[in-house]
């Protein structure tokens, strides 16, 4: 927090020039801080706070069980983190065995952290086993995928009220609001489909079959093209919204790849794709399309984030318990930072002043 010492003499003594200088001083943001990255540690039940200038961990926040998806509020004053009381159950475990695992439904929700104090201030309730979510452009609503219940929950950020619940496919994960705020896309892992939701009516418009186990979604800047990672067929798919009723394979990656996180790098017209157990970030040029590069980053990269200026890519590496920073011009690793246990997602706050 930035403290400002005000003059102690009477306001009548101020000249116009002094008043203008004081006004300029008071316009300095009161919450200015160094650039930060926030990283969820799924098995560590915490969020690591990184100073991106120094490339080091400066704080750790205990946040709740199984923190995964995370987003910053539009003004950067709050950090939202999806937490879940449902134990891990990988795809190799039968559904009937997963159903026997002990769960704590009271732990489910979206944890809200004050970024000035780095304290947990409240828990917004959602559906069962929230995993990923997106934030409305006005910052008033969260759109939350609930993996266990096959639903999308719409939550009012201010009141905490659940405004509506939308049935989607089995094991929803990726959630993305289009840049024009017209569409919400939700991936259904087990349903091998994406669901297209009208963001105004909050009704499902259609579902589109997409490969095997779609995980994450990215939009083109014009909101017309959607890119989807297909984990079990090592591919990236694409479709047109809202007209298309099908998806096409954009590119086939290596068979050992397990695509998860997606980011569209608009200035360079390319995608960054985390490949899970393959331990790399795939760089895919939309032109062609073609595989530009593969960047080894760590064990099981999952969530990824791109800096505001597009110069740095951050990768949360779940099995090596670290975050990797990549120079997006040279496509070389510039730094690795140890964080908590099983980092899952990362989000950046690199606004200045």
Regions from the language model: what does each represent?
Residues 25-353:
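Predominantly soluble domains enriched in secretory-pathway, periplasmic, or organellar proteins
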């Amino acid at each position: 927090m930035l403290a400002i010492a005000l003059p102690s003499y009477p306001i009548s003594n101020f000249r116009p020039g002094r008043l203008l200088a004081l006004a300029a001083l008071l316009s300095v943001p009161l919450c200015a801080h160094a650039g930060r990255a926030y990283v969820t540690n799924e098995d560590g039940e915490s969020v690591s706070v990184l100073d991106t200038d120094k490339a080091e961990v400066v704080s750790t926040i205990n946040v709740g069980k199984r923190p995964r998806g995370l987003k910053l509020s539009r003004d950067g004053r709050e950090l939202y983190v999806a937490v879940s009381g449902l134990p891990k159950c990988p795809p190799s475990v039968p559904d009937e065995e997963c159903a026997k695992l002990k769960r704590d439904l009271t732990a489910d929700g979206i944890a809200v952290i004050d970024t000035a104090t780095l304290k947990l201030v409240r828990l917004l309730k959602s559906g069962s086993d929230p995993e990923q979510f997106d934030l409305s452009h006005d910052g008033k609503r969260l759109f939350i995928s609930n993996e266990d219940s096959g639903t999308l929950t719409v939550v009012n950020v201010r009141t905490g009220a659940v405004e509506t619940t939308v049935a989607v496919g089995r094991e929803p994960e990726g959630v993305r609001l289009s840049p024009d705020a017209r569409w919400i896309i939700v991936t259904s892992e087990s349903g091998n489909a994406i669901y297209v939701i009208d963001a105004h009516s909050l009704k499902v418009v259609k579902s589109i079959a997409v490969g095997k186990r779609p995980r994450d979604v990215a939009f083109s800047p014009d909101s017309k093209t959607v890119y989807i990672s297909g984990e079990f067929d090592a591919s990236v798919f694409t479709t047109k919204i809202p007209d298309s009723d099908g998806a096409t394979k954009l590119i086939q990656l290596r068979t050992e790849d397990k695509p998860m996180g997606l980011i569209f790098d608009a200035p360079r017209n390319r995608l960054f794709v985390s490949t899970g157990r393959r331990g790399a970030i795939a760089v895919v040029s939309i032109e062609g399309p073609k595989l530009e590069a593969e960047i080894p980053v760590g064990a099981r990269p999952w969530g990824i984030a791109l800096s505001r200026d597009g110069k740095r890519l951050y990768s949360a590496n779940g099995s090596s318990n670290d975050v990797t920073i990549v120079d997006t011009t040279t496509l070389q690793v510039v730094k690795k930072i140890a964080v908590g246990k099983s980092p899952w997602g990362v989000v950046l706050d690199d606004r200045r002043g």
